Amino acid sequence: QKYSVILGRPTDKSITLSVLFDQNIEYQVEYGIQSGNYLNKTAILTENANIPKEFDLEGLSKNTRYFYRLQYRIKGGTNFTPSPEYSFITARDPGSSFVFTVEADEHLYDKKGVDNMYRICLENQLKDKPDFMLSLGDTFGDDHNATTITSAELKTLHANYRPFLANI
């Protein structure tokens, strides 16, 4: 199965996960404050192929790094498969330092963009261990045909970026 997880809307007590699989899946998210030690988990969730699902992990502690992974299986299957471990940090205390990255104008939807160069840029940003990333636009190119673009075309543009954005 191919999947992507994109994190967003972090607060001092929660974070939103957007999860997308390419097959009909059952899964849960395991998470905790020590690498490899997941004391918390969500209920088992069901997702249809190629439809992103957003949900919040709530009741988190501020200024804390959480480690998480998915446990997933084909809908109706018996054995779960663990994903690699990922992490995030909840909002830091006011006045404390943090790290963020900025990216813009990658233009992967037209001849100006280069997938491998964008991948290298994201890998370099990841080395900074950012708390979050700001994107300043020209991400999807949906404004190039503003009056004629279809919902299906928008869905494809957005789906093409998930593998990139899920890595930071």
Regions found by a protein language model. Give the residues of each.
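Acidic, histidine-bearing metal-coordination/catalytic regions of metal-dependent phosphoesterases
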Residues: Q1-L108, E123-D128
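Active-site neighborhood of divalent metal-dependent phosphoester/pyrophosphate hydrolases
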Residues: G95-I168
